[in-house]
Design a protein with these regions (language model features):
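Membrane-embedded helix-loop-helix hairpins and adjacent transmembrane boundary segments
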Residues: 1-384
Length: 384
């Protein structure tokens, strides 16, 4: 949430001359308004519109860049320059840590899961995931090519702010700039909305176990989910104002999920032996190890660590990247060890089956009000 708010804050500051902090408040207020009003429905429909804007803007920017400057890739930065993945001198540990954190750590993201769980059927969810993967790869490649070209031809650097914003402000035609900026805002709003909605829903439903009450004048689950959004946006806004680095905040979020939850989540899909003890121990150890490493690191993913750093002589910049991979390995090892020492108990399994059955009944009740979806009732809930 904070990482996406930073992008909006910088955008409003540079192009609308709105102070950074006020820009964040305005952005989060707009996202919160439509998220509270429509929940997953508004999140899904606005997401579809926002995706269309982003795709059109990306293609337009790529075409303009190619026609104006050509596509220029600096030496050593091309797709076949594998030194970036094999040589520590070229940042291989950091690059691998980024790929693993974003590629595996993001699997645990609940704003992603809510879209999967909300799909009409498993088949629809599968097709949507593959389609989204292709579009994400294409859009990411486009912006990478544009950024590399801008750096090589125009000499733009991140020292003067986001390279994309400099390019849009000084070089790109106004109409195209507006379209691309709309795409940036759309992408940020879509992710921020999903983060707000998913986090509040999990806190209320899974942590505090609030449930819908049939026949109630005001559904307590809906009321408390909306109420939980307020503190979430306050904390996210505070972090965005204090740590104004989009890439660092986004990567840190996935980095922590990788260290705490990714291993147990993926293994738990296929391996029924682990129980609560294994999950909680692995998550606790992973979090502790990653925070300690973060405090010792002078740099974090290649930039100065201004999040949490304790000056020391034990750890140098060479440890950057390795910290992410090592924390994940330690957490996963603890999870496997605890799974063998303290397997899932019969009581835990019985409780989980009861939860699955309750979810199945709740889903059937909800789908009964939507006849066109009735054939897929129960499709998204299985014993696994």
């Amino acid at each position: 949430l904070a990482g996406n708010l930073v992008a909006c804050g910088y955008l409003l500051e540079r192009f609308a001359h709105i102070p950074y902090a006020f820009g964040i408040v305005i952005s989060v207020g707009l996202v919160l308004a439509y998220t509270i009003a429509g929940g997953l429905v508004s999140d899904a429909y606005t997401g579809a519109i926002q995706t269309a804007i982003t795709v059109v803007a990306s293609i337009g920017l790529l075409v303009w860049t190619a026609m104006t400057f050509g596509i220029v890739i600096p030496e050593g930065m091309g797709p076949f320059d594998f030194e970036q993945l094999t040589s520590a001198a070229h940042g291989a540990p950091i690059n691998w840590a980024t790929l693993v954190a974003l590629g595996i750590g993001d699997v645990v993201a609940i704003d992603f899961m809510q879209r999967v769980f909300g799909a009409r059927s498993p088949q629809v969810a599968r097709r949507a995931c593959f389609t989204a993967a292709i579009i994400t790869a294409a859009v990411g490649t486009i912006f990478a090519l544009v950024a590399l070209t801008a750096s090589a031809v125009l000499g733009l650097t991140a020292a003067d702010g986001p390279v994309l914003y400099q390019l849009l402000d000084q070089w790109v035609p106004p109409a195209l700039s507006i379209l691309v900026l709309s795409g940036v805002v759309a992408a940020s709003f879509s992710t921020a909305s999903g983060a707000i909605l998913a986090t509040s829903a999990v806190i209320v439903r899974n942590v505090f176990r609030v449930r819908s009450v049939e026949g109630a004048r005001r559904d307590p689950l809906l009321v408390w989910t909306r109420a939980a959004m307020i503190p979430i946006v306050i904390v996210g806004s505070f972090m965005a104002i204090r740590i104004s680095q989009t890439g660092v905040l986004l990567t840190l979020a996935f980095d922590l999920m990788l260290a705490c939850l990714a291993g147990p989540f993926i293994a738990g899909v296929f391996w029924m032996r682990p129980g609560r003890a294994a999950i909680l121990t692995a998550a606790g150890v992973g979090l502790g190890v990653r925070v300690v490493f973060l405090a010792l690191q002078p740099t974090f993913y290649g930039v100065e660590n201004n999040i949490l750093h304790v000056p020391n002589t034990l750890v140098t910049e060479a440890f950057d990247g390795w910290a992410t991979l090592l924390a994940f390995a330690i957490s996963m090892s603890v999870f496997v060890l605890m799974a063998w020492l303290r397997p899932r108990t019969a009581g835990e399994l019985e409780y989980e089956l009861q939860v699955v059955e309750a979810l199945r009944l709740e889903q059937e009740k909800e789908l009964a009000t939507a006849p066109e979806l009735a054939p897929t009732a129960g499709a998204g809930v299985t014993a696994n």
